Amino acid sequence: MPPKKKVTGLIKLQIQAGAANPAPPIGPALGQHGVNIMEFCKAYNAATEAQRGNVIPVEITVYEDRSFTFITKTPPAAELIKKAAGVAKGSATPHTAKVASLTREQVREIAQTKLADLNANDIDAAEKIIAGTARSMGVTVTD
Protein backbone atom coordinates (compact mmCIF):
# COMPACT_ATOMS: atom_id res chain seq x y z
CA MET A 1 0.00 0.00 0.00
CA PRO A 2 1.44 3.41 -0.93
CA PRO A 3 2.14 5.87 1.89
CA LYS A 4 -0.69 8.28 2.70
CA LYS A 5 -0.41 11.81 1.33
CA LYS A 6 -0.36 14.57 3.92
CA VAL A 7 -3.44 16.82 3.85
CA THR A 8 -2.63 20.54 3.86
CA GLY A 9 -6.10 22.04 3.45
CA LEU A 10 -9.84 21.47 3.30
CA ILE A 11 -11.87 23.95 1.25
CA LYS A 12 -15.67 24.07 1.30
CA LEU A 13 -17.43 25.98 -1.49
CA GLN A 14 -20.95 26.25 -2.91
CA ILE A 15 -20.76 26.55 -6.69
CA GLN A 16 -23.39 26.50 -9.45
CA ALA A 17 -23.34 23.06 -11.10
CA GLY A 18 -21.38 23.04 -14.34
CA ALA A 19 -20.45 26.71 -13.97
CA ALA A 20 -17.14 26.67 -12.09
CA ASN A 21 -14.66 29.22 -13.46
CA PRO A 22 -11.35 30.63 -12.15
CA ALA A 23 -12.92 33.98 -11.23
CA PRO A 24 -13.62 34.85 -7.57
CA PRO A 25 -14.63 33.24 -5.25
CA ILE A 26 -13.19 29.97 -6.63
CA GLY A 27 -9.83 31.24 -7.92
CA PRO A 28 -8.58 32.91 -4.72
CA ALA A 29 -9.83 30.08 -2.47
CA LEU A 30 -7.94 27.45 -4.46
CA GLY A 31 -4.97 29.66 -5.38
CA GLN A 32 -3.90 30.21 -1.78
CA HIS A 33 -3.54 26.43 -1.40
CA GLY A 34 -1.56 26.12 -4.64
CA VAL A 35 -4.18 24.03 -6.47
CA ASN A 36 -4.33 24.05 -10.28
CA ILE A 37 -7.55 26.09 -10.62
CA MET A 38 -8.38 25.16 -14.23
CA GLU A 39 -7.88 21.46 -13.51
CA PHE A 40 -10.40 21.70 -10.63
CA CYS A 41 -12.89 23.72 -12.69
CA LYS A 42 -12.84 21.18 -15.54
CA ALA A 43 -13.22 18.21 -13.15
CA TYR A 44 -16.04 19.90 -11.16
CA ASN A 45 -17.95 20.95 -14.29
CA ALA A 46 -17.71 17.42 -15.70
CA ALA A 47 -18.90 15.89 -12.41
CA THR A 48 -21.89 18.25 -12.02
CA GLU A 49 -22.97 18.61 -15.66
CA ALA A 50 -26.16 16.59 -15.07
CA GLN A 51 -27.27 18.86 -12.20
CA ARG A 52 -27.06 22.19 -14.06
CA GLY A 53 -29.13 24.96 -12.45
CA ASN A 54 -28.52 23.76 -8.89
CA VAL A 55 -25.99 25.03 -6.37
CA ILE A 56 -23.78 22.08 -5.43
CA PRO A 57 -21.61 22.23 -2.30
CA VAL A 58 -18.15 20.75 -2.77
CA GLU A 59 -15.48 19.73 -0.24
CA ILE A 60 -11.96 19.93 -1.70
CA THR A 61 -9.11 18.15 0.10
CA VAL A 62 -5.69 19.57 -0.81
CA TYR A 63 -2.53 17.49 -0.30
CA GLU A 64 1.05 18.67 0.24
CA ASP A 65 2.08 17.76 -3.32
CA ARG A 66 -0.64 20.23 -4.48
CA SER A 67 -2.89 17.45 -5.77
CA PHE A 68 -6.52 17.43 -4.68
CA THR A 69 -9.65 15.33 -4.39
CA PHE A 70 -13.19 16.62 -4.10
CA ILE A 71 -16.55 15.33 -2.90
CA THR A 72 -19.81 16.85 -4.13
CA LYS A 73 -22.76 17.01 -1.74
CA THR A 74 -26.50 17.38 -2.30
CA PRO A 75 -27.84 20.91 -2.96
CA PRO A 76 -28.55 23.00 0.20
CA ALA A 77 -32.00 22.44 1.75
CA ALA A 78 -32.85 26.14 1.35
CA GLU A 79 -32.18 25.93 -2.42
CA LEU A 80 -34.37 22.83 -2.77
CA ILE A 81 -37.17 24.47 -0.74
CA LYS A 82 -37.03 27.66 -2.87
CA LYS A 83 -37.18 25.58 -6.05
CA ALA A 84 -40.13 23.46 -4.81
CA ALA A 85 -42.03 26.53 -3.54
CA GLY A 86 -41.27 28.52 -6.68
CA VAL A 87 -39.91 31.58 -4.88
CA ALA A 88 -36.73 33.56 -5.55
CA LYS A 89 -35.82 34.00 -1.88
CA GLY A 90 -37.13 33.37 1.61
CA SER A 91 -39.04 35.91 3.71
CA ALA A 92 -37.12 38.74 5.37
CA THR A 93 -39.45 38.37 8.38
CA PRO A 94 -40.28 34.64 8.40
CA HIS A 95 -42.56 34.64 11.47
CA THR A 96 -44.82 37.44 10.25
CA ALA A 97 -44.70 37.35 6.44
CA LYS A 98 -45.12 33.97 4.74
CA VAL A 99 -43.90 33.75 1.14
CA ALA A 100 -45.14 30.31 0.05
CA SER A 101 -46.31 26.91 1.24
CA LEU A 102 -45.18 23.33 0.69
CA THR A 103 -47.12 20.09 1.07
CA ARG A 104 -45.95 17.20 3.26
CA GLU A 105 -45.18 15.21 0.07
CA GLN A 106 -42.86 17.97 -1.21
CA VAL A 107 -41.09 18.09 2.17
CA ARG A 108 -40.71 14.27 2.12
CA GLU A 109 -39.25 14.44 -1.40
CA ILE A 110 -36.68 17.07 -0.35
CA ALA A 111 -35.87 15.07 2.81
CA GLN A 112 -35.27 11.96 0.68
CA THR A 113 -32.86 13.91 -1.55
CA LYS A 114 -30.98 15.36 1.45
CA LEU A 115 -31.02 12.23 3.67
CA ALA A 116 -27.42 11.26 2.87
CA ASP A 117 -26.04 14.66 3.99
CA LEU A 118 -28.37 15.27 6.95
CA ASN A 119 -27.61 14.28 10.50
CA ALA A 120 -30.75 12.13 10.66
CA ASN A 121 -31.30 8.41 11.14
CA ASP A 122 -34.61 8.03 9.31
CA ILE A 123 -36.84 9.85 6.84
CA ASP A 124 -39.16 11.23 9.56
CA ALA A 125 -36.28 12.96 11.36
CA ALA A 126 -35.05 14.32 8.02
CA GLU A 127 -38.56 15.66 7.28
CA LYS A 128 -38.56 17.56 10.59
CA ILE A 129 -35.19 19.13 9.75
CA ILE A 130 -36.42 20.23 6.30
CA ALA A 131 -39.72 21.53 7.75
CA GLY A 132 -37.74 23.58 10.29
CA THR A 133 -35.58 25.07 7.54
CA ALA A 134 -38.73 25.91 5.55
CA ARG A 135 -40.31 27.58 8.59
CA SER A 136 -37.23 29.73 9.14
CA MET A 137 -37.51 30.87 5.49
CA GLY A 138 -41.15 31.93 5.85
CA VAL A 139 -42.50 28.89 3.98
CA THR A 140 -45.44 27.12 5.63
CA VAL A 141 -45.79 23.33 5.55
CA THR A 142 -49.37 22.13 5.00
CA ASP A 143 -50.81 18.62 5.28
From Swiss-Prot:
A single GO cellular-component term on record: cytosolic large ribosomal subunit
One GO molecular-function entry: structural constituent of ribosome
PTM annotation, UniProt: One or more lysine residues are methylated.
InterPro entries registered for this protein in UniProt: Ribosomal_uL11, Ribosomal_uL11_bac-typ, Ribosomal_uL11_C, Ribosomal_uL11_C_sf, Ribosomal_uL11_CS, Ribosomal_uL11_N, Ribosomal_uL11_N_sf
Gene Ontology terms describing biological process: translation
Keyword Protein biosynthesis recorded: no
Domain of life: Bacteria
Assembly behavior: Part of the ribosomal stalk of the 50S ribosomal subunit. Interacts with L10 and the large rRNA to form the base of the stalk. L10 forms an elongated spine to which L12 dimers bind in a sequential fashion forming a multimeric L10(L12)X complex.
UniProt function note: Forms part of the ribosomal stalk which helps the ribosome interact with GTP-bound translation factors.
HAMAP family xrefs: Ribosomal_uL11
Family the UniProt entry places it in: Belongs to the universal ribosomal protein uL11 family.
Name used for this protein in its record: Large ribosomal subunit protein uL11
Organism, scientific name: Beutenbergia cavernae (strain ATCC BAA-8 / DSM 12333 / CCUG 43141 / JCM 11478 / NBRC 16432 / NCIMB 13614 / HKI 0122)
